[in-house]
């Protein structure tokens, strides 16, 4: 048992000064005034840093020089372990490894690997995000068109049978029958709209069928026009739909993030959609069967198509504060509490309270990570 002291604590709801977080057996035992700590307890100083729940990234293709995509060798427990270690350096304690449009065979391998990883590493990766393959070719982005397809009963059944390790599926609502969306949602999978050319009417039909999330708002969806709001307009119009947004200033203009925040409130989640260069020093990598080039913060293919980001969660937090003018407490909720709610893990993650998993991060006022704790263990100390 130990207590984190001498920092500013953000519980997920409020900032507390002169308080401590007591950690024991991998869980938060209490959040209490420093004056109430037992005299014999070990105290670990935060040296004035801000202590927050660990960040939760619900869309992450790769980082730390690796990708959970493309090949049987890459879709492995080892890749997920490398991604977790890279994440921890940027304050991210939990994430959804994202496997983009690929073959049935590699999807099934991803499920097997996820099951093995979850048995070995609790409260870190939180299940698989399958981004595709039921997308609209018009909005495929960097996804391999040879693998984009319509749903078939066998694959739908397989996903539902493995819903305990598949947390989220991204699909184009106009390409997937309502009964398939409902079946996935009823199995306990978060169904997300993305890589879609849906009209407002098609998007709303998808929402009624069971879609509760939207993948990287504004990206890989039609422009909003006066007569046709499209998927983006539907997301902004529907109060209960969660969505992720990439806050690197390259995927989405900061003015659009501000507008989305005004409309979506507590349903807007920070995501990175990161790829191998995040937390690594590389200039190119393979993604969706293509060479992707990393230059000046951009990840693009040979045609200039955006192909994921190099963003880390702490960089996204800083960008939302410094470039969007969103208050720090609300930005931290966008990186912790709101994604936890979106994927249904808020009872154990996303806030600092007694009984919650002790996944936390600490950072300086200039957004440098000083400490990351996973299951009560300090995994990063700087």
Curated annotation (Swiss-Prot):
Knockout or disruption consequences: Synthesizes high levels of glucosamine-6-phosphate deaminase and over half of the amount of glucosamine-6-phosphate synthase compared to wild-type.
Annotated positions binding Zn(2+): 131, 195, 216
UniProt effect for mutating residue 143 to Q: 180-fold decrease in catalytic efficiency
Cofactors, names only: Zn(2+); Co(2+); Mn(2+); Cd(2+)
Keyword entries, A-Z: Carbohydrate metabolism, Hydrolase, Metal-binding, Zinc
Reactions the enzyme catalyzes: N-acetyl-D-glucosamine 6-phosphate + H2O = D-glucosamine 6-phosphate + acetate
Consequence of changing residue 59 to H: Large decrease in catalytic activity and substrate affinity, and increase in the average amount of Zn bound to the protein, suggesting that an additional metal ion can bind to this mutant
Effect the entry attributes to changing residue 131 to Q/A: Large reduction in the amount of the metal cofactor bound to the enzyme
Documented activity regulation: Inhibited by high substrate concentration and by products glucosamine 6-phosphate and acetate. Completely inactivated by the treatment with 5,5'-dithio-bis(2-nitrobenzoate) or 2,2'-dithio-pyridine (2-DPDS). Inhibited by 1,10-phenanthroline and EDTA.
Cofactor-binding details, from the entry: Binds 1 divalent metal cation per subunit. The highest efficient metals are Zn(2+) and Co(2+), followed by Mn(2+), Cd(2+), Fe(2+) and Ni(2+).
Binding site for substrate: 142-143, 219-220, 227, 248-251, 306-308
pH dependence (record): Optimum pH is 8.5.
E.C. number: 3.5.1.25
Function: Involved in the first step in the biosynthesis of amino-sugar-nucleotides. Catalyzes the hydrolysis of the N-acetyl group of N-acetylglucosamine-6-phosphate (GlcNAc-6-P) to yield glucosamine 6-phosphate and acetate. In vitro, can also hydrolyze substrate analogs such as N-thioacetyl-D-glucosamine-6-phosphate, N-trifluoroacetyl-D-glucosamine-6-phosphate, N-acetyl-D-glucosamine-6-sulfate, N-acetyl-D-galactosamine-6-phosphate, and N-formyl-D-glucosamine-6-phosphate.
Listed name of the protein: N-acetylglucosamine-6-phosphate deacetylase
Species assigned in the record: Escherichia coli (strain K12)
Lineage: Bacteria, Pseudomonadati, Pseudomonadota, Gammaproteobacteria, Enterobacterales
């Amino acid at each position: 048992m130990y207590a984190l002291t001498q920092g500013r604590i953000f519980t997920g709801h409020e900032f507390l000064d002169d308080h401590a977080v007591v950690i024991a057996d991998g869980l938060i035992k209490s959040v209490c005034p420093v004056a109430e700590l037992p005299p014999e307890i070990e105290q670990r100083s935060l040296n004035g840093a801000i202590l927050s729940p660990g960040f939760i990234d619900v869309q992450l293709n790769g980082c730390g020089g690796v990708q959970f995509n493309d090949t049987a060798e890459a879709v492995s427990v080892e890749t997920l372990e490398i991604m977790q270690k890279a994440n921890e350096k940027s304050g991210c304690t939990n994430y959804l490894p994202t496997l983009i449009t690929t073959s049935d065979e590699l999807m099934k391998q991803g499920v097997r690997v996820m099951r093995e990883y979850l048995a070995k590493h609790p409260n870190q990766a939180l299940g698989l995000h399958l981004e595709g393959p039921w997308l609209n070719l018009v909005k495929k982005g960097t996804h391999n068109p040879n693998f984009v397809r319509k749903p078939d009963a066998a694959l739908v059944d397989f996903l539902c049978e493995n819903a305990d390790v598949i947390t989220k599926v991204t699909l184009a609502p106009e390409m997937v029958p309502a009964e398939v969306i409902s079946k996935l949602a009823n199995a306990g999978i978060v169904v997300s709209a993305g890589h879609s050319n849906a009209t407002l009417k098609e998007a709303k039909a998808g929402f009624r069928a069971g879609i509760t999330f939207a993948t990287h708002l504004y990206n890989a969806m039609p422009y909003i026009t006066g007569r046709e709001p499209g998927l983006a307009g539907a997301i902004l119009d529907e109060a209960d739909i969660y969505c992720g947004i990439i806050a690197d200033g390259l995927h989405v203009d900061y003015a659009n993030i501000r507008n989305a925040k005004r409309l979506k409130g507590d349903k807007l989640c920070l995501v990175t959609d990161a790829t191998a260069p995040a937390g690594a020093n590389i200039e190119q990598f393979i993604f969706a069967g293509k060479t992707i080039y990393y230059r000046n913060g951009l990840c693009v293919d040979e045609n200039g198509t955006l192909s994921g980001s190099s963003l880390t969660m702490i960089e996204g937090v800083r960008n939302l504060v410094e470039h969007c003018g969103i208050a720090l407490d609300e930005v931290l909720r966008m990186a912790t509490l709101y994604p936890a709610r979106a994927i249904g893990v808020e009872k154990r993650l996303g806030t600092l309270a007694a009984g919650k998993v002790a996944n936390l991060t600490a950072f300086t006022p200039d957004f440098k990570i000083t400490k990351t704790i996973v299951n009560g263990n300090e995994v990063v100390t700087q």
